[in-house]
């Protein structure tokens, strides 16, 4: 579990990754293109889809983001279970 905790904290340690999670928690099941457009327009970020894909890889390694095929698109899904499990140990 410690390795997973480290991965979660690493993932949350970057402001862009936190914005990605904010967007996915607000509107789950976004494509990479939709997520990129939302980040650029809402937060005035200067970021490419390739850079977002790298951030998503870190979030996926931490278990915070998963993806699934929906038709011809791959949609991104926020998974808050790792955060709940992490906090459960400290709060309970």
Curated annotation (Swiss-Prot):
GO biological processes: regulation of DNA-templated transcription
Organism: Bacillus subtilis (strain 168)
Keyword DNA-binding set for record: yes
Protein's UniProt name: Uncharacterized HTH-type transcriptional regulator YuzN
Pfam families, alphabetized: HTH_20 (PF12840)
PANTHER family assigned: TRANSCRIPTIONAL REGULATOR, ARSR FAMILY, TRANSCRIPTIONAL REPRESSOR SDPR
Range of residues in the leader sequence: none
Ranges in coiled-coil conformation: none
Key words of the record: DNA-binding, Transcription, Transcription regulation
DNA-binding region: 37-61
